[in-house]
Amino acid sequence: KEYTLDSSNLVICDGVKPVAIAGVMGGLNSEIRDNTSEVMFECAKFARDNVRKTSRALGLISDASSRYSKGVDEYATVMAIDRALHLIEELGCGKVSSTRVDANTGNSVEPREMKVSTAKVNGVLGIEVPTEEIIRILTNLNFAPVVNGDELTLQIPAYREDMESYPD
């Protein structure tokens, strides 16, 4: 299927033509087939709002667009590609080139912190959850809660760009 794109749609190109709609869907010319002998791995972070708008405008929902729309931890992309390349070599699935390109734009997400009281958490939930349980849940979600009386200080994981205030 063909899609009409506009200047707000981010695409990935091979130097000549588009090969994917960034964060949404790869094109036919990027598929792996039985006769594929070379593969390029890409791990990227795209602006979640742009991916969400493009996906909706084109009516194109994919696993990729769902993930990118929620925000991606840019640091996890490096770990993910390193792990994938390690497994390819370790399992004998292919030979990894020594060429690696890092096109970091420098738009890193600054570490963020949020303070919230357990009373506010319970108010949002509409039920009384013991502080120990709140701490356990937030720890499992990688928020590294620090308790100071009734107040919790949370370290917001970089991949949770959707977290802007305590109800989130």
Regions found by a protein language model. Name each.
Residues 1-168:
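RNA/tRNA-interacting regions in translation and RNA-turnover enzymes
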